[in-house]
Structures are given as C-alpha cells and as structure tokens.
C-alpha cells in the first residue's frame, strides 16, 4: 500500500511538471507573439495590490497637504483683511473726530473773531470820537492863539487912538495905504485857507481898486505869487468884499483868465493870484501861495 501511494504521488508530480512546462511554452508563445506583432492588443498584467495601495496613499497625502496649505492661506488672508478693516474703521473714526474738533475750533475762532471785531469796532468808534474832540479843542486853541495877538494889537491900536486924540491907526506889522491896512504873509496856504485866515483877522483877502494900490502891493509883496480876493467859483468873477468887478480896475496877464485845465491837479482855475511880474492870473485854488489881507483903517476894536 505504501508503494501504491508513492506511485500516485509520482504520477501527480509528473502531471504537474507537464502542466507547468505547457504553461511556460504557452507564455513563451504569447511573448513571442507580442514581440513579433506590434498590434498585439492584450492588457498588461495588473500591479500587485500593495503597490497600488501605496500610490493612492501618496495622492491622499498630497491632497491633504494642499488642502491644509489652502486653509492656511485663507486664514492668513482673512486675518489680514480683518486687520485692514479694523485699521480702516479706526482711521475713519479718527478722521471724523478730527473733523468735528476742527469744526468746533473754527466756530470758536469765528465767535472770538466776531467778538474781537466788535471790540475793535467799538474802540475805533471811541478813537474817532476822541480824535474829533481833539480836533475841536485844537481848533478852539488855535483860534484863541491867533486872536491873542489880534487882541493885543487892538489894545495897542486903541491906546494909540486915544493918545492921538482920535487919529486912526493900523495894528502892529500892518502897513497903511490909502485909508486901509495891509498885512503880507511869510508862508503859503491854499486860496480858501488864506481867505479864512484873513477873516479871523477881521479882514479879507486883498482887493485892488486902482493902479496906485496895485503898485503899492507889488512893492511890498516881493517876488512871490500872492492870492488876492478874486474868484469865479460861482461861474463869474467876484471880489470877496462885494466890490463891482466889471467896472473896477483889472490887471490880467495876456490871454488870462483862461481857466486852463491841463494841470495835474485836475479841475478848473477859479482863483486869482498876482504873478511875480505884477500881472494877474487865474490858478488852481488848491495851489499853495503867499497871500495878503486888507481891512479899513478906521476899524477899531
């Protein structure tokens, strides 16, 4: 029996060897067919399972790493965005507070400026009033100072009048001619200022009625231009004391009066003056000239 069992095993071994040899021959034949025929369309043998499992694991790891990296990037961007948004709102709030503070400061400054302007206007009003008062006091003082010599001359004239038994007299520094007293200035004024000065002396600007009086005036006034009491401000020439102009003595220079308006001062020539050669000329009334005052000798004060 043992021999029979050994024979059976030998038989199986031979069959297996024969089958393996056949398989090898068949595989060799198939390999030869693949080599000889490039169009062989057979599927390649599949890889072992462990190798396939390892490839899938690597892909999963790569996908997981990519997802983690993407999540980190999203978190960083989100954090920066929140920080920027926070800084933006902080800056906006700061700007709003600055605008509010600046507006309040401007309003306060405007309010203080208005108060200061009011105070400044009030002070200007007070100063203007003070200036007017000072000018008024100055005019009064000037009036008294100018009249003090006049009062002194009046007393002197009255004393001379009584001492001369009623003889008429002229004040000190006045020159007598033909029953009138004349005073010649040593400085200059405009025509209106000179006329006012003579009135303060109880006199008037010089009025010339004759050739003799003209020569007397030219002799005493020197080589200066002097104002006389003749004007056409109203459109026609008139003497300040009311003396008739048309029928009275005249000594105009050639082509005068011409009312020339080409000078720089502007306006017309409405006031008469005696030139250095003794002839009369119409001139701009704001011109500064010397002048002469005249009054009757028989006036006593």
Swiss-Prot record:
Regions of this protein lying in the Cytoplasmic compartment: 1-58
Positions of glycan attachment: 97, 119, 165
Molecular function GO labels: D-mannose binding; fucose binding; pattern recognition receptor activity
Key words of the record: Calcium, Disulfide bond, Endocytosis, Glycoprotein, Lectin, Lipoprotein, Membrane, Palmitate, Phosphoprotein, Receptor, Signal-anchor, Transmembrane, Transmembrane helix
Ranges in coiled-coil conformation: none
Disulfide partners: 170-181, 198-293, 271-285
S-palmitoyl cysteine lipid sites: 54
Main location group: membrane
Tissues where this protein is expressed: Expressed exclusively in hepatic parenchymal cells.
Domain C-type lectin span(s) in chain numbering: 169-295
Transmembrane parts of this sequence: 59-79
Additional information: Calcium is required for ligand binding. Two types of rat hepatic lectin have been identified, RHL-1 and RHL-2/3, having a relative abundance of 4:1. RHL-2 and RHL-3 only differs in their carbohydrate structures.
Subunit structure: Interacts with LASS2.
Protein name: Asialoglycoprotein receptor 2
Species of origin: Rattus norvegicus
């Amino acid at each position: 029996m043992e021999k029979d069992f050994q024979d059976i095993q030998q038989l199986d071994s031979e069959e297996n060897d024969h089958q393996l040899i056949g398989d090898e021959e068949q595989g060799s034949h198939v390999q030869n067919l693949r080599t000889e025929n490039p169009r062989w369309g057979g599927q390649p043998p599949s890889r072992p399972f462990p190798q396939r499992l390892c490839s899938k694991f690597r892909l999963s790891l790569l996908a997981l790493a990519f997802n983690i990296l993407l999540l980190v990037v999203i978190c960083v961007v989100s954090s920066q965005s929140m920080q920027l948004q926070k800084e933006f709102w902080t800056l906006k709030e700061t700007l709003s507070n600055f605008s509010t503070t600046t507006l309040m400061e401007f309003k306060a400054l405007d309010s203080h400026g208005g108060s200061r302007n009011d105070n400044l206007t009030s002070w200007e009003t007070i100063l203007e009033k003070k200036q007017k008062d000072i000018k008024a006091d100055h005019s009064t003082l000037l009036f008294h100072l100018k009249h003090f010599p006049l009062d002194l001359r009046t007393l002197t004239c009255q004393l001379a009048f009584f001492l001369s038994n009623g003889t008429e007299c002229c004040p000190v520094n006045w020159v007598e001619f033909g029953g009138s007293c004349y005073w010649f200035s040593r400085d200059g004024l405009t025509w209106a200022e000179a006329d006012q000065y003579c009135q303060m002396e109880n006199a008037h600007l010089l009025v010339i009625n004759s050739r003799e009086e003209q020569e007397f005036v030219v002799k005493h006034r020197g080589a200066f231009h002097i104002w006389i009491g003749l004007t056409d401000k109203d459109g026609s020439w008139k003497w300040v004391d009311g003396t008739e102009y048309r029928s009275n003595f005249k000594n105009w220079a050639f082509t005068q009066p011409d009312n020339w308006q080409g000078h720089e001062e502007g306006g017309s020539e409405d006031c008469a003056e005696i030139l250095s050669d003794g002839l009369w000329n119409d001139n701009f009334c704001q011109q500064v000239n010397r002048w002469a005052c005249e009054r009757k000798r028989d006036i006593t004060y």
